[in-house]
Amino acid sequence: MLDGELNRWFLDPLLRGTYPHDVLERHAPNAPPVRDGDMALITAPIDFLGVNYYQRRVVAGTADGGWRTVHQDDSQHTDMGWEVSPDGLRDLLVRLHDDYAPPPIVITENGAAFGDA
């Protein structure tokens, strides 16, 4: 569900022309209305897809249908507690390519917080 709310909620309408059904069902009472003409505007061609990436997030489901972050003890972490996982950006870019075949991708933000910087 977290993937739907943080990723697919934004990418699916832009690159597929529809909102993810699982997220819509979960949030139906609070979902914004989609009016005539909205999807035509949302799916207008874009020159590039900007990606802001700082860390991967490993999660597990909870009994109430929510999620919790699973701390990766065997990984290096920044001073802010973010896991250092260089493969995460690569995995994201591969997923975007495989799932969406987007226009050119521009890494618009990334980085980490360390005490010496």
Name each region found by the language model:
Residues 1-117:
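Active-site region of glycoside hydrolase catalytic domains
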